[in-house]
Amino acid sequence: MELDGKVAMVTGAGSGIGKAAALRLARAGAKVAALDHTEESARKTAEKIRGLGGAAIALAADVSDAAAMQAAYERVGREWGRLDVVFANAGINGVWASLEDLTPEEWAKTLTVNLTGTFLTVKYALSLLKERGGSVIITSSVNGTRIFSNAGASAYSSSKAGQVAFAKMAALELAKHRIRVNVICPGWIKTEIEDSTEKRDLEEIQEPIEFPEGPVPLTDGGPGTAAQVADLVLFLASDAAAHITGTEVWIDGAQSLLQG
């Protein structure tokens, strides 16, 4: 599963799954464009890759900003002249609240970052990807694909379901260009994203469901790791997955089978 000589764009590369994937792809030989919403977080990931002997550039951009994403890919083209892998991973949990309490602005922000951001990440990659073909991997979630019991996650789940539909449409459209498009659906993974989730008054709509032994059967209830997800990203980016496209892969330790 070596990626020697290949170039990868990773969004949300400053932390969590994105950072782990950027490092994993670099260890496999890829040159990595580490993109995050802040310059500092992108720079730290790029520096870590270079410290391991890899090649990386840091890019700061809001994935929902069309001009910024177009400029980011132009920088990749100038730097390395090619693109082989896109990991469209950036996203937010947003606000989790009842439908009555969730504001239109909160709904729109989650959909804009997660779904429009994915569209722009793929759209502006195509001029480079079409030159040689390649692999696009999109981070969705168990929410909106198998799990619908997390109260208040209507905006988040809708954005994640939308990513799956988008990926399937893109996979068919881009197959003739030898571009594969697949989706990963992580369950409970130990990252920092939960810390930025705003949950409001969910007690009023939460169904009283309990899992005494924890929600993840494969790990005796505990979460998976970002490194495990990064290994899946590497597989889908590599030639080992050369005949896989338009497919969701759940990486959740059977959580969604229990909790959905």
Where does each model-flagged region fall?
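Substrate-binding pocket helix/loop in short-chain dehydrogenase/reductase
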Residues: 97-99, 103-108, 212-214
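Short, small/polar-rich loop/turn modules that mediate ligand/substrate recognition or access, typified
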Residues: 175, 180, 244-246
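Short C-terminal tail/terminal secondary-structure segment
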Residues: 4, 93-96, 233-234, 245-260
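Catalytic Tyr-x(3-8)-Lys segment
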Residues: 202-228
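Active-site helix of classical SDR
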Residues: 122, 159, 167
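Residue(s) in the substrate-gating loop at a strand-loop-helix junction
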Residues: 141
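Conserved glycine-rich cofactor-binding loop
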Residues: 7, 14-16
